[in-house]
Amino acid sequence: GSQITGVQAPPLALELNTSPVPVPNSVLPQNSTNSPILNRDRAEEVIRTWLSSKAQALGPEHRIEALNAILTDPLLASWQYRARVFKQNNSYQQFRHSVSIESLSYPADNPNEGEITATVREVAKLYRNGQPIQSESYDSTLKVRYDVVRKNQSWRIQEIAVLEQ
């Protein structure tokens, strides 16, 4: 065979931090609450967001608007009402939570709805006029079903049912 000598190709410049072809945004990883697929991580994030929002709405600062980020009606309206009553009664709660996702499912024909079952431990201390009310404070572990729906690219809880105490 013949050989070609004395010919050198220029070095190839290759950067791995950019794509050689444009990648549509829909392919890139998104903020997980915006992700269309209800998987285990998403389910846990939805429940943790709910518990955090609940703690803010019923907490000493009465951040009722926090509920808007995770609940949808009719559940949203009932929790807003509950939070306003707490504020009017000069009451608030402090929470500690732990969550374990037990199962999740969604209909094959509608990935915008789903059901999450979780075991939630809630330790709550109630305060009225700045004083702790022991009789209304509790430490409970509950099995809870959350019915969720995706609205505006974000998962929201539309119904909560306690299955076991």
For every predicted segment, state its role.
Residues 53-54, 102-104, 145:
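Generic recognition of flexible, low-complexity loop/linker segments
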Residues 27-97:
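Core segments of small alpha/beta cavity-forming domains
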Residues 91-94, 106-108, 136-138:
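Generic marker of residues within folded, mature protein domains
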Residues 99-109:
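Short amphipathic beta-strand and strand-loop transition segments with alternating hydrophobic
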Residues 47-48, 71-74, 102-104, 114-118, ...:
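N-terminal, helix-rich and Lys/Arg-enriched segments in bacterial and organellar proteins
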Residues 3-5, 111-165:
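Exposed beta-sheet edge and beta->alpha loop/turn motif
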Residues 1-28:
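Amphipathic, hydrophobic N-terminal targeting peptides for secretion and organelle import
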